[in-house]
């Protein structure tokens, strides 16, 4: 039996893959394949669990490549920020930014940037054509009202109904369902009051206890760089994120390089603002026009899109509209969980926007667009490093938030392999859904596009669907377990679709999320 103590449940419409379509990576006209679902509403926990099973969102569309069939297998990749050390090339980018801010220096020669992958140029493109045909953005108000009415009715009739026929409800669920248009969003991200929340322009403070742990860690490293340090961490002492100020023989940390003080007469000022992706937020609304213009400029210059292909409808659908319900739990980060735009303001003008999701365990990179006039600053790399540092900063307040999700890694695509340079990082096994260090995966990927990374032949998907009858369905204005729903169905293809959905989302999500069936 499912309970939604946190508020509204996730509500999704599932569409199994039927055809192959054009691949945005290798340009194969009929090589890409994925399954997808339209998320009317989704909790941050459900989306995080879906990420851990190889799913990814683009706007409100959530998709999962058919890994053993698609031409360019897309492996979920995450970086471990707590252990991250910037490489020489990363340091070069950060120093280049500091020189530009301090003295206005512009590097000579061209610079190839490494932006996070475009969720609009990949496998999603083919599936959106299907979604438009199916008119998935149907009468969502009716759906919301139906769910609310079903749950209210269940509350009144709970004594009369059999316990297995309907599930316990929350009266507010209908009010909190995400609508098809972001401007109608009901649930608004809470904006931290002045003086609260993470200050993105400054490194976080350190506690005396953390400083003592750091001293002990350094002492152990000097005595035994491998064994004793591992024992120290195994006792529950994480490695310090912000070590003492670097000495001449100690490399600077990521934070030292990002937040290095600038002279009072610096040539430029860079400010990073975290803005909830909601039209109910005044800062998001006031900066929308400038942000949209930047997006068009980026798409035309970098991806060679036609201006007509970069309308406000497309921009809003992909980068502003999100199914994620904002949450601000007391033990979470001050900014809360949900979808955000991380805006980079240079001298009062937006030059880059990183679209991110903040989840219980992850900061997830969705998309980046920037002003091509500032390509010499390598804003793709710079923003990724800032997001890694931001994850470390959030970890100081919320200890479980300790991973940076970089989307998909495609070994067969040269433009996507750069993600493997943010070490340490892990790839998700497409069969058992366990994380495996990327170093262990690369040899296999050199021999085959599709690989099972888990080397244990006996290992299985621990969250595989074992009790499909417990899957939750919303059908004919009622919420019911699949065991009840299937008794009303005679179409064998419907059973196949529902069981496929259950196998892809896993047992936990299948019991929490509502599968909408018309």
UniProtKB/Swiss-Prot annotation:
Record's keyword annotation contains Nucleus: yes
Region Disordered, residue ranges: 149-207
Keywords: Acyltransferase, Cytoplasm, Nucleus, Phosphoprotein, Transferase, Ubl conjugation pathway
Origin species: Macaca fascicularis (Crab-eating macaque)
Subunit: Monomer. Interacts with LIAT1; LIAT1 is not a substrate of ATE1, the interaction takes place in the cytoplasm and seems to increase ATE1 arginyltransferase activity.
Compartments, record wording: Nucleus; Cytoplasm
Functional note: Involved in the post-translational conjugation of arginine to the N-terminal aspartate or glutamate of a protein. This arginylation is required for degradation of the protein via the ubiquitin pathway. Does not arginylate cysteine residues.
One Pfam family matching this protein: ATE_N
Family per similarity comment: Belongs to the R-transferase family.
Basic and acidic residues biased stretches: 149-165
Protein's name according to its UniProt entry: Arginyl-tRNA--protein transferase 1
């Amino acid at each position: 039996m499912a309970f939604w103590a946190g508020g509204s449940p996730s509500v999704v419409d599932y569409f199994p893959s039927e055809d192959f379509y054009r691949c945005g990576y290798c340009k194969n006209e009929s090589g890409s394949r994925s399954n997808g679902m339209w998320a009317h509403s989704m909790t941050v926990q459900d989306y995080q669990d879906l990420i851990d099973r190889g799913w990814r969102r683009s706007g409100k569309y959530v998709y999962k490549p058919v890994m053993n069939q698609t031409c360019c297998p897309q492996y979920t990749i995450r970086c471990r920020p707590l252990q991250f050390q910037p490489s020489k090339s990363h340091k070069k980018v950060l120093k280049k930014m500091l020189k530009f801010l301090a003295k206005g220096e512009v590097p000579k020669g061209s610079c190839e940037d490494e932006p996070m992958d475009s969720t609009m140029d990949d496998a999603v493109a083919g599936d959106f054509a299907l979604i438009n045909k199916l008119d998935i953005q149907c009468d969502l108000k009716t759906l919301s009202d139906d769910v609310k009415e079903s749950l209210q009715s269940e509350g009144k009739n709970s004594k009369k109904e059999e316990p297995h026929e309907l599930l316990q409800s929350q009266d507010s669920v209908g009010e909190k369902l995400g609508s098809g248009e972001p401007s109608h969003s009901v649930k608004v991200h809470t904006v931290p009051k002045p003086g609260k929340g993470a200050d993105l322009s400054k490194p976080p403070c350190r506690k005396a206890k953390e400083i003592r742990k750091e001293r002990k860690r350094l002492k152990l490293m000097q005595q035994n760089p491998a064994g004793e340090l591992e024992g120290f961490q195994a006792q529950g002492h994480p490695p310090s994120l912000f070590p003492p100020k670097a000495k001449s023989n100690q490399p600077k940390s990521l934070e030292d390089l990002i937040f290095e003080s600038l002279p009072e007469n610096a040539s430029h000022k860079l400010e990073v603002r975290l803005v909830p992706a909601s039209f109910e937020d005044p800062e998001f609304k006031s900066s929308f026009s400038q942000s949209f213009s930047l997006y068009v400029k980026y798409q035309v210059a970098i991806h060679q899109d036609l201006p007509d292909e970069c309308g406000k409808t497309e921009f809003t659908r992909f980068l502003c509209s999100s199914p994620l319900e904002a949450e601000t739990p007391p033990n979470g980060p001050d900014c809360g969980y949900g979808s955000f735009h991380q805006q980079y303001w240079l001298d009062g003008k937006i030059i880059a926007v990183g679209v991110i999701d903040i989840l219980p365990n992850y900061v997830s990179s969705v998309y980046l667009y920037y002003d091509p006039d500032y390509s010499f600053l390598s804003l793709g790399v710079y923003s990724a490093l800032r997001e890694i540092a931001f994850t470390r900063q959030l970890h100081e307040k919320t200890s479980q938030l300790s991973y940076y999700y970089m989307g998909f890694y495609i070994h067969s695509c040269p433009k996507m392999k750069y993600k493997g340079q943010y070490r340490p990082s892990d790839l998700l096994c497409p069969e058992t859904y366990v994380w495996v260090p990327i170093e262990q995966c690369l040899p296999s990927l050199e021999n085959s596009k599709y690989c099972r990374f888990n080397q244990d032949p006996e290992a299985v998907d621990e969250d595989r669907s074992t009790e499909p009858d417990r899957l939750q369905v919303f059908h004919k204005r009622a919420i019911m377990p699949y065991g009840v729903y299937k008794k009303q169905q005679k179409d064998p293809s419907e059973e196949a679709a529902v069981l496929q959905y259950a196998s892809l989302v896993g047992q936990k999500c299948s019991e929490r999320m509502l599968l909408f069936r018309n």
